[in-house]
Amino acid sequence: MRTYWLFLLLGGVVSAESLLSPNKRSKEASMDEWTDQQKGIAMGHMLNNIGDSGMHAKDINPGCIIASPSTDSPDYYYQWVRDSALTIMTILDRFFEGDKGLEPIIVKYMDEMVRLQKVPNPSGDFYAGGLGEPKFNVDGTSYDGDWGRPQNDSPALRAIAFIKYMNYLFENGKEVHEVTVWIEAVLADLDYTANHWTEASFDLWEEIKDVHYFTLAVQKRAMQDGTAFAKRIGAPDQAALYQRTIEPIDLKLGEFWDPGMGVIKGYKGRVDRSGLDCSTLLASLYSNEFDMHILPTLLKLQETMTRDYPVNQGWKQAMGRYPEDVYDGVSKSIGNPWFICTSSAAEIIYKAIAYYDNKGLPELTEYNIHFFMKFAEFGDPYNWSVIRKNMHTYADNFLKAVAEFQHPNGSMSEQFSRDDGHQKGARDLTWSYSSLLNAIYRREAIKGSV
């Protein structure tokens, strides 16, 4: 399988030009063909950022997942707990689908995370505060510079990733006593989450210290997954703790719905921001539930960014983090579209299609009618087959933007210019590849369904 990834990195790439040219699309390359090729290309680029065998990750700790090989302007050559967990979850999904050659990477990642938990750092140590530390050096030592600390989504996401793999192990005959070190790590992260979820921490963009929608959403999932996990390993006290934490988190999440704007806000009480933020899309993707309010939120984001970004001409739907963004990838000037956000917008729609395929269309309300009417024909918002087809096209347009602005070899940085689409910021961002793969496989999962 790794040979296949390397082959795709060296050649055989469906070009964005052939994909996007209306006259060539049907003859030379379809979206299906491009996404099929990107499975190997994006996976290859992503694995290049994982130590100690990746092309960009030589001579670093085994299992260390670097955010990017960029060491200057900007310097992202660190391992973030969040980014690493999200990356390994993408790898776990491929492993569960049969790519067993990925298992050594998963094991090395988990062992590296166990080590990092015990490293004293500016946030504290294993017993007091240290699990909220957001990033570490690639040799596994503490990063002691100034940073946005703590980031309390990190231990929750790490616990979710660990539980995914350990549930697989238990289902395939592994005994609890064989993985006690990993169990200790999971319970530590879950206990931290249960005891600190009410506290302000920095958001996933590392800019605002507050209570955030994304952080709460992944903390809720950690408590849900953790409840079942604790019961499975025979830890009833922890199971009870996690169980009783779920409802208050859920109630807090409800406070982020703004009926006046008709959107879920990423944060509240900021006079300098509307609260419209791509982080809410990511929260929906990494949670266990599907909140129907996420669709009008996505539409509002897309319409705002289509208006604000000159690069969004015609069908293009490049997505950035939030309308007021000023981070240009290196310094502060003006924000740009991000590959993470653009791919995740597509994935949200594919997830919604799968949900409505199973559940049927919801009751129309003043909040969702605009979304469904956008995809209806002849004013009929109840014809699911028509709405589904048009939603799928809408989702594919996000991926077409990714195809146009990635490099010919499939490489993706963090951002691309809002003006001309040239890539900006940290090169070969691991999360960019992870988010694209997630969208592609979510798209594949709804093929053939009605």
Curated annotation (Swiss-Prot):
Pfam families for this protein: Glyco_hydro_15 (PF00723)
Top-level taxonomic group: Eukaryota
EC number: 3.2.1.3
Active site (UniProt): 203, 206
Chemical reaction(s) catalysed: Hydrolysis of terminal (1->4)-linked alpha-D-glucose residues successively from non-reducing ends of the chains with release of beta-D-glucose
InterPro entries the UniProt entry points to: 6-hairpin_glycosidase_sf, 6hp_glycosidase-like_sf, GH15-like, Glucoamylase
Secretion signal span: 1-16
GO BP term (any one): meiotic cell cycle
GO MF: glucan 1,4-alpha-glucosidase activity; hydrolase activity, hydrolyzing O-glycosyl compounds
Similarity annotation: Belongs to the glycosyl hydrolase 15 family.
Protein name: Probable glucoamylase
Annotated organism of origin: Schizosaccharomyces pombe (strain 972 / ATCC 24843) (Fission yeast)
High-level lineage: Eukaryota, Fungi, Dikarya, Ascomycota, Taphrinomycotina
Gene behind the chain: meu17
